[in-house]
Swiss-Prot record:
EC class (word): ligase
Assembly and binders: Homodimer.
Motif ('HIGH' region): 12-20
Residues bound to L-tryptophan: 135
Official protein name in the record: Tryptophan--tRNA ligase
SUPFAM superfamilies xref list: Nucleotidylyl transferase
Sorted UniProt keywords: Aminoacyl-tRNA synthetase, ATP-binding, Cytoplasm, Ligase, Nucleotide-binding, Protein biosynthesis
InterPro entries per the UniProt record, alphabetical: aa-tRNA-synth_I_CS, aa-tRNA-synth_Ic, Rossmann-like_a/b/a_fold, Trp-tRNA-ligase, Trp-tRNA-ligase_bac-type, Trp-tRNA_synthetase
E.C. number(s) listed in UniProt: 6.1.1.2
């Protein structure tokens, strides 16, 4: 029996954070034995916001090296760079013609990003969800690991797939969301009511995977908790967002349950919690960065992995695109 197909990807824009690691990359590693996994670096999506060309090239290879450092195995998974597979944009054009203007206008991420980048509200930003739909449908993905901020885009992907299938038969698998039960949402250190974001301009909110572990430890020790007297280390997202975020991070890094951590820190000060989180995260980053540099310093290996991954991805992508072109009436040669 064939394994379910899973596809996911990360933009090479901004340094990846511990939120990307705990919420995505580490979850992907666990999926490799049970699913047929395709993991891409979505550089086409990245240019919806202006990028420095050299920085984008460097960041793309950085992300590839981080994939490998985290344990994503090219022998088990297909790892590729989005722009190396032209079928993504070819399918996206066809899907654009089966997607309505009003549907795109309702996308909350477009509204958010266009407000932040008012000087560059481009058509690519507007149709971003259609390219994302093409990314997913091209590989007949059954499940897509998504965070809360991408659920709306997966819903429009399902709508497009169902619309196309109703017209032309069951050409596309209709994907389901895969939302992990734990580690899916790491919050900002200083503003724990909002998600940690690699694009946050206040870098004290963010734990970057490639940051100096000592600098990260200092950030964690300055993280927001609360003013309860006496201090109570308890998981309560509504009333103790900062403490809950630190517990989530510590649970993700150590593998201990929230209940175990609450018992461990019963009667202790917030400084004790912060110190433990800082030590555990610093140790994890040190190990991860050693593995990262091992791969990043071998650019020939990275290029080989990207090339082989693109070849494997294109085999699957071409089969889907050929079927779509046949369905809509294009002449084949």
């Amino acid at each position: 029996m064939s394994k379910p197909v899973v596809l996911s990807g990360v933009q090479p824009s901004g340094e990846l954070t511990i939120g990307n690691y705990l919420g995505a990359l580490r979850q992907w590693v666990k999926m490799q034995d049970d699913y047929e996994c395709l993991f891409c670096i979505v550089d086409l999506h990245a240019i919806t916001v202006r990028q420095d060309p050299e920085s984008l090239r460097k960041a793309t290879l950085d992300v590839l090296a981080l994939y490998l450092a985290c344990g994503i195995d090219p022998e088990k998974s297909t790892i590729f760079i989005q722009s190396h597979v032209p079928e993504h944009t070819q399918l996206a054009w066809v899907l654009n013609c089966y997607t309505y203007f009003g549907e795109m206008g309702r996308m909350t991420q477009f509204k958010d990003k266009s407000a932040r980048h008012a000087e560059n509200i481009n058509v690519g930003l507007f149709t971003y969800p259609v390219l994302m739909a093409a990314d997913i449908l091209l590989y007949q993905a059954n499940q897509v690991p998504v965070g809360e901020d991408q659920k709306q885009h997966l819903e429009i992907t399902r709508d497009i797939a169902n619309r196309f299938n109703a017209l032309y038969g069951d050409l596309f698998a209709v994907p389901e969301p895969f939302i992990p039960k734990a580690g899916a949402r790491v919050m900002s250190l200083l503003e724990p009511e909002k998600k940690m974001s690699k694009s946050d301009e206040n870098r004290n909110n963010v734990i970057g995977l490639l940051e100096d572990p000592k600098a990260v430890a200092k950030k964690i020790k300055r993280a927001v908790t609360d003013s309860d007297e006496p201090p109570v280390v308890r998981y309560d997202v509504q009333n103790k967002a900062g403490v809950s975020n630190l517990l989530d991070i510590l649970s993700g890094v150590t593998g201990k349950s929230i209940a175990e951590l609450e018992t461990e820190f019963e009667g202790k000060m917030y400084g004790h919690l912060k110190g433990t989180v800082a030590d555990e995260v610093s140790a994890m980053l040190t190990t991860l960065q050693e593995r990262f540099h091992h791969f990043r310093n071998n650019e020939a290996l990275l290029n080989d992995i990207a090339r082989e991954g693109a070849q494997k991805a294109r085999e699957r992508a071409k089969a889907t695109l050929d079927a779509v072109y046949q369905a809509v009436g294009f002449v084949s040669l």
